[in-house]
Amino acid sequence: MSLYENKKVVAIGGGHGLGRMLAALKVFGSNATGIVTTTDNGGSTGRIRHCQGGIAWGDTRNCINQLITEPSISSMMFEYRFKGAGELNGHNLGNLMLTALDNLSVRPLDAINLIRNMLKVDVNILPMSEHPSDLAALAMDGKWVTGETSVDEMTQDLRRLDLAPEVPATKEAVTAIQDADCVILGPGSFLTSVMPPLLLPELGKAIARNQTAKVIFVENLSPEYGPAGRMSLEQKLEWCERACQGRKIDVVLGHHPHPELEQRWNFVTRDLASANRDWRHDRQKLRQAIEEQLMN
């Protein structure tokens, strides 16, 4: 039995980072699962949430886009973005399709699975929660800031991060973590992509209780801006471990060494950058690095 058939891998995050990771893990097929952040309130996603309510679909759509292997009319439609004047300008048709299917389905996960089947995507895609929630940050001056876009623009550092309102985790996401041989955090925007799923107590507890899984934190290749950009790697790792009830991160996978932190964490340094875009992870290099950890 091959590694791809024998090991179950869960990646947690959002945005382009999670999509990139899932594309690297595509060889695992249905043994790979992405748990996607659903708190975005900007762009096409934010406009849809403002009008229709519901969870944010943009990160889920992005992940599915990066997993499409067979170009088709359906995939072209799913990736289409409207241009020009009027209310449709800037909207992504995939976001609208997911919203429509959500309205027609019993639960948001049904909408995702319908799209996955239509586009022949084997990797499991799970929303962190099927209930709408926003990111909320407590600034150093004691004021709360609500919404991903507002958190990204904060000039003050953060005391804490929360979800408003508190929502339950998707039960399939909890099960996927319980059954995983490897749980991957990142890459991606730390505060707005990696942290939101970890703010759900059920997901943090599931990671803490799965003592046989290898928990891997994947560093970004380029610096972040806003409050996340002012956080040290040490702070980010501590935030993740705190959200996971003190569960130790087993491996920090990155492009550069961090000798000052090697007493506390196990660092694995690899060339992970794409040859033509050094700010973006190379799918093949990511896959090889994760496989290496699964075999150790």
Curated annotation (Swiss-Prot):
Matching InterPro entries: CofD (IPR002882), CofD-like_dom_sf (IPR038136), Gluconeogen_factor (IPR010119)
Gene Ontology molecular function, alphabetical: LPPG:FO 2-phospho-L-lactate transferase activity
Protein name according to UniProt: Putative gluconeogenesis factor
Matching PANTHER family: GLUCONEOGENESIS FACTOR-RELATED, UNCHARACTERIZED PROTEIN YVCK-RELATED
Primary role: Required for morphogenesis under gluconeogenic growth conditions.
Subcellular location: Cytoplasm
Lineage: Bacteria, Pseudomonadati, Pseudomonadota, Gammaproteobacteria, Vibrionales
Gene Ontology terms describing biological process: regulation of cell shape
Main location group: cytoplasm
Keyword Cytoplasm attached: yes
GO cellular component, one term: cytoplasm
